[in-house]
């Protein structure tokens, strides 16, 4: 006999994915340490752990999509909780980048004697901010406008237009990533070239990683939009992707102004 549910909350069924994800993370961590210290079997254990994590992510998110789209477990109350949770996740990401900017300004506002007492450090040839960095700024801002276009299309019930807008967003994101990779390849300094190289590649590389994650997030949203999963009443997944993408936009603006422009003067 099925008991009636007298509340708006989603009580999830028992799932094997939390423990499988934990085992994958353990294997990845141990394998990574073994690989870095050249222990036999480290690379295999690291690869196995990563595969396990990716598989767990796929099947876990698949179950969440089933629960929300097909089974109707994501009520208004559940959706509100998901929104609050994702906002807190973005706040935690802000703290990550705050630490990177702190390291950059700590090093640049009071340059140590080891780097010549100047910023950029002596011997460092910086990148021109008005070449690829400025072009990437325009591309990323355009992608932010495109994802907003997709949001308005979803709210208006225009499914095809939303798909087109998401495709445009993803294409712009891929172009941005390509230019970023080109910039890294052509950079006249490396991550080991003083504190400048360390903070530059750490901050911009971490941002680039977020761009890749956000691109995958938007691709999934585009597929779901094409399949008719997203409606104007229920599109929390897309909202989370859009918020994440706007966060990536804002971080890039800070990176461009502080590290590329001001930090290269």
Curated annotation (Swiss-Prot):
A stretch of 270 kb of the mitochondrial genome is duplicated within the centromere of chromosome 2 resulting in the duplication of the gene. The expression of this duplicated gene (At2g07687) is not demonstrated. It is also probably not RNA edited and therefore differs in all the positions known to be edited. The gene is COX3. Its EC number is 7.1.1.9. GO terms for biological process: mitochondrial electron transport, cytochrome c to oxygen. GO terms for cellular component: mitochondrial inner membrane; mitochondrion. Component of the cytochrome c oxidase, the last enzyme in the mitochondrial electron transport chain which drives oxidative phosphorylation. The respiratory chain contains 3 multisubunit complexes succinate dehydrogenase (complex II, CII), ubiquinol-cytochrome c oxidoreductase (cytochrome b-c1 complex, complex III, CIII) and cytochrome c oxidase (complex IV, CIV), that cooperate to transfer electrons derived from NADH and succinate to molecular oxygen, creating an electrochemical gradient over the inner membrane that drives transmembrane transport and the ATP synthase. InterPro entries: Cyt_c/ubiquinol_Oxase_su3, Cyt_c_oxase_su3_dom, Cyt_c_oxidase-like_su3, Cyt_c_oxidase_su3-like_sf, Cyt_c_oxidase_su3_a-hlx. Belongs to the cytochrome c oxidase subunit 3 family. This is Cytochrome c oxidase subunit 3. PROSITE patterns: COX3. CDD domains: Cyt_c_Oxidase_III. Keywords: Membrane, Mitochondrion, Mitochondrion inner membrane, Translocase, Transmembrane, Transmembrane helix. Pfam families: COX3. One of its GO terms (molecular function) is cytochrome-c oxidase activity.
